[in-house]
């Protein structure tokens, strides 16, 4: 086959450790905002809603019986960059799958919304470390439309690099792995175990890193080995952390689950944990849980003294073939079809389709926080006469990392086996 006859390959990668995003402080009068500022904020709210919707849909379709850990925001970010180049049937399918049509999110407001969230996402904070980055690598003999390139650079802050996938594949592989390692503080040191195929013409990357510390840290002296029931049935011994304190908490009868919020320092970001009352109740919880029901649940949490027992855990997940299959089952089929993909908005021609999409995540939760470093002393003794509610996560549970002001779900996952 001649090179000119090939449908060129486009690859998408999302790399993350953890992330946080914050939107504008909406306390001032919106009627006095410039129109463009108002559109950015409205766009950012719609980006939040669609990102959360997409995350829940993908979580449901991954249909894994083991651990799950995904970043809805990271996936939504890279899919948005791709969507802006989609046309025809491919665009319509992405509209439905990503939820854009349900909130009337057009391309211009999508760009403004992501621009707004990215500006604040990368704002400096003394309470946590955060980095996020977008990158697009282009075969140096390949042409993309100038307006598309400028949009990614100006609105998404993407670093656009010319590379040689054809003649210097191994060098490009090393460059990509070095970029990934740098952006994730070496938490994900290698993405590519082998060079990309020579027919690759574009590769999108999104990398995010978050390092947070609990507002109230667990006392490591209280951590002990205890039983966790893998998949709700199989007992195993794991390190369990203990903490007594006042936290937002509730029992939700409609979900037959306990809900607990553990804030990170600064209270801008929290971990939400949903624990089924029944040891094998995770499937029922996931069936009844949605983005809207989560919002309803968290709005009804009340601060109360709780004895918390949760496992230390580390999850490292990679999604590739199963991610592609899930997106196709959700309705995004033409994007991966050599015959039917339409990404004319990227090149001006129908010469691209997606051959590979990779989503890699890593999270570590310990006494200090989420991949926190350093040692601190915390007074968190447990009284023998404690009569307050308990939250004992000794069987499968669902968790979310959420930005509290915006409501955006940064990460979501299931701890099923340790």
Curated annotation (Swiss-Prot):
Q: Which InterPro entries is this protein grouped with?
A: Serpin_CS, Serpin_dom, Serpin_fam, Serpin_sf, Serpin_sf_1, Serpin_sf_2
Signal peptide as annotated in the record: 1-24
**Known tissue expression:** Expressed in hemocytes (at protein level).
Entry's localization field = Secreted
Q: Name one GO cellular component term.
A: extracellular space
Domain of life, per UniProt, equals Eukaryota
> Gene3D superfamilies, alphabetically?
Alpha-1-antitrypsin, domain 1, Antithrombin, subunit I, domain 2
What biological-process terms (Gene Ontology) are attached? negative regulation of serine-type endopeptidase activity
In its record, the post-translational modification comment is: N-glycosylated.
Report the Pfam families cross-referenced here.
Serpin
Q: What is an example of a GO molecular function annotated in this UniProt entry?
A: serine-type endopeptidase inhibitor activity
Task: Provide the site residues for: Reactive bond.
Answer: 383-384
Q: Which SMART domains match?
A: SERPIN
Glycosylated position list: 49, 404
* Protein family membership: Belongs to the serpin family.
Could you tell me what this protein does?
Serine protease inhibitor that specifically inhibits clotting factor C. Does not inhibit clotting factor B or proclotting enzyme.
Q: What's the subunit arrangement here? A: Monomer. Forms a covalent heterodimer with clotting factor C. Interacts with big defensin.
- Which PANTHER family does this one have? GH10112P-RELATED (PTHR11461:SF211), SERINE PROTEASE INHIBITOR, SERPIN (PTHR11461)
The protein depicted here goes by the name Intracellular coagulation inhibitor 1
Q: What is the native source organism of this protein?
A: Tachypleus tridentatus
Q: Tell me the organism's taxonomic lineage.
A: Eukaryota, Metazoa, Ecdysozoa, Arthropoda, Chelicerata
